[in-house]
Design a protein with these regions (language model features):
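HIT superfamily nucleotide-processing domains
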Residues: 1-163
Length: 163
């Protein structure tokens, strides 16, 4: 967990986009079946259409809230189940534990009430024996390259059976 004295520019831009365009809420409400991995009445897991990492997964409540504490116990259980299921799918994808970064998004100060809380899992493998490293072009340009299109990643993840 990091606490910063200022809001990083990229996070500020994301918050402004959420406030002005309701981007995450609109995405959660209209994600295509090709990108959806799993959902119940309260929460969804999916590969974002602009995934930056192969097999990246986002987990979000359907209800637009700033943070998880604004959800009911039932909704929190749904988020938890989607998150655990997503991590299990990543671990089963290549038959070994998947290293990943998990980002939990809350509104920065000043953007409360205009944010849609979500969790992003950014897996560090692009194949069984290949880790995802940022290439020079990615570090220089900020554009991310991926070995797999989001729809194919979602299809592979969706096909994994969870016990």
């Amino acid at each position: 967990i990091y606490a910063l004295p200022t809001i990083p520019e990229i996070i500020k831009r994301q918050a402004i986009n959420q406030k002005e365009k309701n981007i995450i809420n609109n995405l959660v409400k209209s994600v295509s079946e090709d990108l959806k991995i799993s959902n119940d009445n309260n929460a969804i897991s999916f590969v974002p259409p602009y995934a930056r990492y192969p097999y990246e997964i986002w987990v979000a409540p359907f209800k637009k809230v700033d943070c998880i504490k604004q959800l009911s116990d039932e909704e929190i259980n749904s988020i938890s189940n989607q998150l655990v299921s997503s991590i299990k799918r990543l671990d089963l994808l290549f038959d070994e534990p998947m290293p990943y970064t998990m980002a939990v998004y809350f509104p920065p100060r000043g953007f409360e009430g205009n944010f849609h809380h979500y969790i992003a899992l950014q897996p560090m493998r692009r194949d069984k024996n290949k880790l995802k490293f940022l290439a020079g072009i990615e570090q220089i340009s900020g554009l991310m390259l991926s070995d797999i299109i989001p729809e194919d990643a979602a299809s592979k993840l969706k096909s994994i059976t969870i016990d």
